[in-house]
UniProtKB/Swiss-Prot annotation, chain B:
Pfam families: GDI. Belongs to the Rab GDI family. This is Rab proteins geranylgeranyltransferase component A 1. It comes from the Eukaryota. It is found in: Cytoplasm. GO terms for cellular component: cytosol; nucleus; Rab-protein geranylgeranyltransferase complex. GO terms for molecular function: GTPase activator activity; Rab GDP-dissociation inhibitor activity. Keywords: Cytoplasm, GTPase activation. Expressed in several neurons including head neurons, motor neurons located in the ventral nerve cord, HSN and CAN neurons, and tail neurons, and in muscles such as body-wall, pharyngeal, intestinal and anal sphincter. Also expressed in seam cells, the hypodermis and the intestine. Substrate-binding subunit of the Rab geranylgeranyltransferase (GGTase) complex. Binds unprenylated Rab proteins and presents the substrate peptide to the catalytic component B and remains bound to it after the geranylgeranyl transfer reaction. The component A is thought to be regenerated by transferring its prenylated Rab back to the donor membrane. Plays a role in neurotransmitter release from presynaptic terminals at neuromuscular junctions. Positively regulates the function of rab-27 in synaptic transmission most likely through mediating rab-27 prenylation.
Amino acid sequence: MAKTYDYLFKLLLIGDSGVGKTCVLFRFSDDSFNNSFISTIGIDFKIRTIELDGKKIKLQIWDTAGQERFRTITTAYYRGAMGIILVYDITNERSFENIKNWIRNIEEHAASDVERMIIGNKCDIEERREVSRDRGEQLAIEYGTKFLETSAKANLNIDEAFFTLARDIKSKMEQNEMRAGGSVSNTGRVNVGGSGTQKKSFFSNWSCNLL
Amino acid sequence: MDEKLPESVDVVVLGTGLPEAILASACARAGLSVLHLDRNEYYGGDWSSFTMSMVHEVTENQVKKLDSSEISKLSELLTENEQLIELGNREIVENIEMTWIPRGKDEEKPMKTQLEEASQMRRFSIDLVPKILLSKGAMVQTLCDSQVSHYAEFKLVNRQLCPTETPEAGITLNPVPCSKGEIFQSNALSILEKRALMKFITFCTQWSTKDTEEGRKLLAEHADRPFSEFLEQMGVGKTLQSFIINTIGILQQRPTAMTGMLASCQFMDSVGHFGPSPFLFPLYGCGELSQCFCRLAAVFGSLYCLGRPVQAIVKKDGKITAVIANGDRVNCRYIVMSPRFVPETVPASSTLKIERIVYATDKSIKEAEKEQLTLLNLASLRPDAAVSRLVEVGFEACTAPKGHFLVHATGTQEGETSVKTIAEKIFEKNEVEPYWKMSFTANSMKFDTAGAENVVVAPPVDANLHYASVVEECRQLFCTTWPELDFLPRAMKKEEEEEEEPETEEIAEN
C-alpha cells in the first residue's frame, strides 16, 4: 500500500496545568474549542497531516495526559519526540516562570537535537495579561527557540506554531539525510502494536517447507 | 506542588513498579478513580531503570520511621474507632554496591571522566529487573489489547549464546540458531543432526495442536522423566540434545519431557512472529514498561504524584479506609501496594533472594560485525541453580552509549558457583574489561495478606526471564478484587485511528 505521507513527526506539548495545551491541540487537530476547564482525561495523541513544500507531513501530537499536574511526566513521554511546543499562559506569571523548569526537564530527558518552540497562549485575554510579549520574546531568544503568542479560543497563530515547528524539523531532517547520503538508516525497531510487522509463525513456516 | 491531593478516590496505588502500574492502568481503564503515589521522585520503584548519573538514587530510598510526636499528629486525622498503621519500607533491593573499576587502558583519563565529558552518562539505562518479552506471550498480548504498545518500541534479542566449558578451553560461547535459516546455516550441527532436528520440530508441530492430556499420552512413560531421555529415544544425539535443552532451557530449567515439550512449543510459537528470534527487549530498558502503563492510567484519569512521603494507612473494622501521605488524608475504598509498602507487622509468606550484578563494558562478550542483543543461558554451568543468565544490551536498545554495553547477570543463590564468578570468567576469557559494576540482592517477597481485606499486594520482583507470570498474577488479583470489571479489555478503535492503521503498519515496516 502506498504511503499517504512523506514524513511522520512526533511532537509534544509541555507546560503547566491549565495553560491550554489540550485546547491548542484540539484547535489544531479538529478546529474546535471548548471553554470549560477539564483536566485532561482520555486524550492520548492527535493526528493531523499537513503539506509543506509539496511534502505530506503527518504530525502526531502528544498531550501530557494530565501528568504535568504534579510534575510527574514520565521520561518515556519524551522518547522519540522530534519537536516540543512549550506552552505558558500570558495571564499566569507562574506558568511563564515554570517554562525554565520544563526546559530543564527537556534537556534531561529528550533527544539533544529536539526542535523547541515557546508559545504564550490565551493572548485573546488582553485585560488579564501578566506576561508581556516582550518578556516572552526575550525568553525565547535566551533559549534560542522561536516564539509566538497564540489563542486557541480565537484561533490565533495556532496553525502557524505547528507549521513553523514542522518546517524546522523538516529542514533539519533533510540536511541530515543529505549528510547521510540520501537515506537515514533504520535500526530495525519493533512496534508490537502494528499487525503489519508480524511474520508467519515458525510452525507455518515449517509446515510450508515440509509440504 | 501547588495542587492538593483529592479527598477521596476509589483506589490508592502505592509504588510505581510494573505490577502496580499494570493494576493502576487496569483500574483506571475500568472507570475507577485512581490516585497513584510513589515515595521516589522517579517512576518504576524496584522495577526502575536508571541513567548512570541517577543510578545512585537506588540507594537513597530510606524512609524514617515515624516518631511518637508524628504519630500523635497523624492520629488527629483519625475519626472514632480508626486505627493508624505505619507503612513499611521493605528492603527489596539490598546490599547495593557500586564501583568504577580502574583499568590500565584508561590511565590517562578514567572512563567516568570520559563519559561525563562526552555527556554520555544519561545514555545508559540500567535495569533493576531486566527481562525479555516472548513475542507471542501474555505481555505482548496485554500491550496490544490495552494499546500501551503505542508508547513503547522493542528490539529483537537477536543472539542467543550457549556456553560449554572444558578444562582445556575454558568457557566457549556458541551461537544458538533459532530460525529455520539459521539452523541450515549453522556449522555447529551436522547434516544428520539437522535432519534429526527437523524431525523433532515436525513432532513439536503436531504435538502443539493436541490438548494437555493427549500431549501427555503421546509422551507415554517419558512424560515426567528428563527431557534428554525423551530426546534420546527420538533419535536425537548428545550434541543436539544439549543444543535443544540449552535453547529452550532459558524458558524451562531442568525440563521433563512434558515441560520440555511445552517450552519447545512456546519457543517455536514465538519464533518468526516479529523476526527470527522469539524474544523482544524494550527500547530504553525494562523500566519503560512501568511508565507506559502509568501513561495509560493517566490517559484514563489516574492522578500521579511522585516524591510524596507515604506514611500510614487507616484501618477500621478490618478494612482500610484511608491513606496518609505527607500529612494529607485520602479516603479510599481499596489500596494496591507494592511489597515494599507492606506494614512491618505483616510477615512475608516467602522470600526468594536473587543475585544481580550489572557490568558496564566497552566490548561485547562475543564480538560480531553488527551489534547484537544477547541472551546467554548459564544453566549448564550452574546446574544446581534455578535461574542463571546473562543479558547483554547496548546502544541499539538505547541502554548504553555507542560502543558500550551493559551486561546483566541474574541468578538465584543455590549451588557453589555464583553467577558473578561465571560472568567474570567469561569476561576474562573474551578479554572484556568492565569499567563499572553494581551488585545487589533483590528480595522477591510474597505476601498472602497485607492485614486487611481491601488491600491488594502486587506481585514482587522475580527472577523469571519473561513477563508472563507478572501479567497473569496482576490479572488474577484484579479479577478477584473486582470480579465485575474487565481487566484491560481490548481498546475500542476510534474512527480516526482505523483510518490511520495501515499507515502505522507502514512505519513499522520501514
